[in-house]
Amino acid sequence: MLQIAMKTGKIKLFSIVGILLTSVLLSACSVPFLSKPQGPVTLEYWGLWESPNTIDTIINDYKKINPNVNISYKKRTPQQYRESLENQIAQGSGPDIFTFHNTWVPMLKEELDPMPASVMSKTDYKNSFYPIAMQDLTIENEIVGFPQGYDGLGLFYNEDIFKAAGITKPPVSWTEFTQDAAKLTVKDESGNIRTAGAALGAASNVDNFSDILGLMILQNGGNPKNPKDKQSADALDYFTSFTKGQNRVWDETMPASTLAFSGGSVAMYFGPSWRAIDIKNANPLLKFKVAPLPQLAGAKVTWATYWANGISANSTHKKEAWDFAKYMATDEVLIKLYAESVKSPGRFFGNPYPKVNLASKLASDPIIGAFVQDAPFAGSAPMASRTLDNGLNDQIIKAYEDATNEVLAQSNATGALETASASIAQILAEFGAK
């Protein structure tokens, strides 16, 4: 009996030792001093608009708290950027982190990595950014990017022309806008426009015409992706009315609208915030401000067009890439990025902040403030100008350009948009968009 007890004791002892050894071996993977040291991680980041000097300042700060992560920023050219991005990621190369437009999500659904819940909860994301971010930057209810700024349309107005006409404030409704545009227009004896009340009504020489028309369709309750409805036709009729007949306030003999506004020959002009930089550089003495967009009666609706940072679905360092993308969207970094951007030659301000809690920092700015005030009410559609995507936006814009020209040539808006709708349906199907 004693021998059996001793053997049993040995077996128990060996079992305990075995369990302990196994535990040590299994835990070696998680204990730093027992695991194999990992080398530094290198991430490639593609951007479009910010200079390497600006981004490198942010990268250097990040590296101080993440010394094992190296980030190489490459500023790409906008032309054929979207196609190059898709092709390289499809081939297993390309960047880990990349900039993309808010309307590109349907085209990049294979390339964008869904954000893990551990990075940020959907509730925190929704509470942090303007509502349009959650609307635009998701695929099947999964978040795929962090907005790096916010932009849209603002109503630029020439202070001197307003003062000369006795108008003391910018219009807040489209009714006021129409009345002011007529009052601000100056023509010569032959009926030629010398000072345009508003740069509006044509596709050929109205920069950002598609954004303006898209805004009007959304405000009127139409569907920019399927503009067969009466609301869309009414919006197109209203848009083109500014160039028609004896009461026109703009026409196709005028220079391109940004150039005309910069030259002081237009009272009101619509554009994104970055156009203010072009205008100030072209004419530093021009006195102008930017107001929130005119509205119809009812719910307020504005327009968004902005850029975000996403992570490649093929990245081998997704954890580190998402961590940096989140870092780029923190309050401190956005504020510093804004300040660093202003240091670039010809820049007077940075990107408007995409976060709700930072709105008060820019709300009183005579240029940026209007965009921040409009941001909570923004909608969007794939007809945003200047994305240079050769895809959804550029092709849908062409369909709307043709429809606008047809109406200016005396065609019916409903008929013109029926043709456009057929083209838009094909374009959406080609890129797998809804």
Language-model features, listed with the residues they occupy:
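Extracytoplasmic/periplasmic solute-binding protein
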Residues: 142-148, 153, 175-225, 266
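Glycine-centered hinge/linker elements that transmit conformational signals in sensory
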Residues: 180-185, 223-251, 293
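Extracytoplasmic "Venus flytrap"/periplasmic binding protein-like
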Residues: 61-132, 136-138, 163-172, 267-268, ...
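Conserved C-terminal helix/tail region of periplasmic/extracytoplasmic solute-binding proteins
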Residues: 163, 377-434
